[in-house]
């Protein structure tokens, strides 16, 4: 079901022309900073991949990819990507990228099963990035170093926005707070996972939650994660499982946390087998991507995605992602948004 958060007394700080210019400036500035911080080269990415190769991202395992037959390939099915998590690792191998360097790309996707609302659209645009690492880098301290580099690019971008539009005051804390999902559960034992995120983000402003996908002490997961890209079972922070996580910010306009990025150290052979077994998904080992990983023809890597529209929405203090990108929305949502001074593109 669709949803609509209705912020009180919302007034856009920028008109439509300023918003479009701001989007352009943010995207250009941030990707240059991201590239230099992580030593990433831009590459061209696919909008769709062949079905049955194990390349598409399964997200939480329940979302249906948009698919279509290809006439010239005997009606073989292609799938619009959900993300490029596994494709990027194949590309690192194809480009023979050295450790310490990587790639980034503009990822465009269609997620037809999204519950549409302020933060969720049918259309997903993000910077997908992947960097080659060594076995010695497969630890939580290295993960935190990479996260802090990305956050540094976010801080600089926020100041650029302030220079261009002085009415938009910087609000990001200088330091990002790290916490494991199990520690977060123990901190707020009576709250559901999403409410825990809101509580911790309201307190610190910017938070990275480590260990997304691993089972917590209550037998549940903080959130789902496909078992074949992020390593969420190897020992990490404070001897707790997980070398991955989500970066979240407190949004003053919506008065809630927003997830801007998911990232992590990727599975090696052992972690892949362990996580597939845990999820009863060992059949996937027969797929092309998984065979490549098991044959040691893919490099060890770290990677993630950063939401472009959400990042722009945060910087420009917008109440709805539809103020940043063009998409399809329920007619009743469009009418309500107009009444609230939320102008959907």
From Swiss-Prot:
Cellular compartment(s): Cytoplasm
Q: Which UniProt keywords apply?
A: Amino-acid biosynthesis, Asparagine biosynthesis, ATP-binding, Cytoplasm, Ligase, Nucleotide-binding
SUPFAM superfamilies, alphabetized: Class II aaRS and biotin synthetases
Which PROSITE patterns has this protein been placed in?
AA_TRNA_LIGASE_II (PS50862)
Q: Which N-terminal residues, if any, form the signal peptide?
A: none
* GO-annotated cellular components: cytosol
Q: Which GO terms describe its biological process?
A: asparagine biosynthetic process; L-asparagine biosynthetic process
Q: Name one Pfam family in it.
A: AsnA
Top-level class of the enzyme under EC nomenclature: ligase
Listed GO MF terms: aspartate-ammonia ligase activity; ATP binding
SS bonds (residue pairs): none
User: Reaction catalysed by this chain?
Assistant: L-aspartate + NH4(+) + ATP = L-asparagine + AMP + diphosphate + H(+)
Enzyme nomenclature, EC number? 6.3.1.1
Q: In which pathway does it act?
A: Amino-acid biosynthesis; L-asparagine biosynthesis; L-asparagine from L-aspartate (ammonia route): step 1/1
What's the family? Answer: Belongs to the class-II aminoacyl-tRNA synthetase family. AsnA subfamily.
Q: What's the protein called, per UniProt?
A: Aspartate--ammonia ligase
Query: What is the source species?
Result: Bacteroides thetaiotaomicron (strain ATCC 29148 / DSM 2079 / JCM 5827 / CCUG 10774 / NCTC 10582 / VPI-5482 / E50)
Q: Which gene encodes it?
A: asnA
